[in-house]
């Protein structure tokens, strides 16, 4: 399944200056020092307590980096960068124009960069609100800031965990992230739920007792509902049977 998704409304910043690599290395979870020209990496900007302030894609573009973030947090992301850049030789240039992302399947959605330019000839970029985009997004565990992740969450509780480089040097929020990793005691994690019945579940709906968890996103898919939910470690194992809003559900690892 190939989906070409319109990302023209996303915020994109070109980062230049002599301190660009050191600055981003010390502020984001992305190991920018490892990015070769043309490569990209997903990650986050954290607060000092290790909570997620922004989800970003960082792409190496010659002697610069391009940072992309959702439209809803584009201004906040730029403000964060500028706040930390007081004594650094860095400059931020907003980029505009068409952009898109290509998803071939849920397993590779997080590998897809944000690409500047028009859609390939003969293809039409779908809006983010397209039901097919939402179904694949949920199967991939592709986060929406303010919906599936926010200032209450650690990156290791989300699919961003796969991008955390524990061999990287210091960055803002690193200590609590490394501490929990070393102790191995995360309490919650984002998982997929396949729920009986084709009626979406309201965000914030709690799982039925005794399971502990909360739905963040959901979408009807055939005669069932697919959802993302933060589950407590006592019920997050793939294949576990839980219930939400009186409906039976099965836990799935992400992507699925």
What is the predicted function of each stretch?
Residues 1-53:
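Acidic, proline/glycine-enriched N-terminal capping motif
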Residues 5-27, 93-104, 185-196:
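Short glycine-/aliphatic-rich beta-strand segments at the starts of folded cytosolic domains
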Residues 51, 158-164, 172-174, 178-256:
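Glycine-rich, small/acidic residue-mixed loop/short-helix segments
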